[in-house]
Amino acid sequence: MADVEVRKEKKKKKIKEEPLDGDDIGTLQKQGNFQIKPSSKIAELDTSQWPLLLKNFDKLNIRSNHYTPLAHGSSPLNRDIKEYMKTGFINLDKPSNPSSHEVVAWIKKILKVEKTGHSGTLDPKVTGCLIVCIDRATRLVKSQQSAGKEYVAIFKLHGAVESVAKVRQGLEKLRGALFQRPPLISAVKRQLRVRTVYDSKLLDYDETRNMGVFWVSCEAGSYIRTMCVHLGLVLGVGGQMLELRRVRSGIQSERDGMVTMHDVLDAMWLYENHKDESMLRRVIKPLEGLLVNHKRIIMKDSSVNAVCYGAKITLPGVLRYEDGIEIDQEIVICTTKGEAICLAIALMTTATMASCDHGVVAKIKRVIMERDTYPRKWGLGPKASAKKALIAAGKLDKFGRPNENTPKEWLTGYVDYNAKKPAAQEVSPTNGSSEPSKRKLSTSSVEETAAAAVSEETPSKDKKKKKKKHKGDEEAPEAAEEEAEPVEKEKKKKKKKDKDRDRDEAQE
């Protein structure tokens, strides 16, 4: 009996509560309202478990904590399901045989969306990580296509090699910048190009069959098939690639919630027939998941829509900024709710931002957020409000320009910076006198202005005649050459006349 009890105790396993994985965003969305709240002092929060772009936000440098939170927009995980689909991506396990474009077209048809794009073409026989961007997320496709890739390849050598060490040594030689030419069967022009291989490892090698498996981390656009051929040449026996799988594209790997085509189909079927969003939210991830490795700048809610319309990203609109921002570095501008507004190129370093109180922080590279997601908050100052009142009263035209009803106070007190300044500006007086100094015209300049006035009054025919005279003067040296040409032209005309006569006679 005692033995039986011991066995039962061994069989009973304690069910451990597994901590929620940060990548499982389907379950994270219901845990809380992820949003930065305005405060007068630094709040003590544990933001290490916050998702996406708000992770560790309390470690960002604070420029200001004072702003007016707006109810518009929402956390990427709490978006409405239709909006969630339009601003998401799928980390897809591409099946063998169909091309990347076919797979993307199928997903577009399954999800019933307007646009889809992918992170870089995979050959039909190649499987693995293919990031499919949906609708608004297609704006990130270019940055994903240029991101680094990782592959696992199976190769076969055409002859025996002395040892596995030789194969490993050959792989190590194929690192750094390499010359590559696309394979015989390829969709692009077969011209020589340089691609960088960052790292490679020989995972396994079978000496009996001369087959091996290696892992490689390389630049986008590298040809692994060509690399296998080069490995065979380095070893002196020749070689070829048998199979290939992409295990990482950018920051998304095959371990980061990769899904199959069947998962996408099942998720959409559940949503359409049972209104169950849970699986669809697990299959599709918010586009902010692709920008986690970018340096962040958090903007005030009132300046979000202005940036969406292309306004400059200036310091007064910045709430927080990350350490280590360098000039010309690609960064992400985000809201207090963790939504990506745009990708930008930094024009200030972190140190400059800390020491300045004005200036342009970054220039926009690609706007991601839809316009008017947040309300317009520009044109609400005292001058702008007064201008709107005058337009409504008819004292300014609909474009805000002065008309006959415009009051004198407005004309003297308002400076329109959008109006184009005249080319000849008045020179500021250098003397102590209040009157602006006027430059006296010389007698020659007076005569020139008078002559110009007379020439303006004369009809345009005289101008044409003058132009013809000038042309005649220019063409004078070429006259000798032109005299020889008429003789040849006359001969040609005679020949044409003779041909015309022959045709007429033939018709008669």
Curated annotation (Swiss-Prot):
Q: Does the keyword Membrane apply?
A: no
Q: Which GO terms describe its biological process?
A: box H/ACA sno(s)RNA 3'-end processing; germ cell development; mRNA pseudouridine synthesis; pseudouridine synthesis; ribosome biogenesis; rRNA processing; rRNA pseudouridine synthesis; snRNA pseudouridine synthesis
Q: Single GO cellular component annotation?
A: box H/ACA snoRNP complex
Phosphothreonine PTM positions: 443, 449, 458
Phenotype of the disrupted gene, per the record: Embryonic to larval lethal. RNAi-mediated knockdown in female germline cells results in a cyst differentiation defect that prevents progression from the 8-cell cyst stage and oocyte differentiation.
Q: Where is the composition biased (Acidic residues)?
A: 475-485
- Per the UniProt record, one Pfam family is TruB_N
Catalytic reactions of this protein: a uridine in RNA = a pseudouridine in RNA
Q: Which residues form the active site?
A: 123 (nucleophile)
Which terms are listed as keywords in the entry?
Isomerase, Nucleus, Phosphoprotein, Ribonucleoprotein, Ribosome biogenesis, RNA-binding, rRNA processing
Query: For the region Disordered, what residue ranges are annotated?
Result: 1-29, 423-508
Fill in the subunit field for this protein: Component of the box H/ACA small nucleolar ribonucleoprotein (H/ACA snoRNP) complex consisting of Nop60B, Gar1, NPH2 and Nop10, and associated with H/ACA-type snoRNAs.
Further remark: The name minifly was chosen to reflect the strong reduction in body size of heterozygous mutant flies.
- Please identify the protein, giving its name as recorded: H/ACA ribonucleoprotein complex subunit 4
Species = Drosophila melanogaster (Fruit fly)
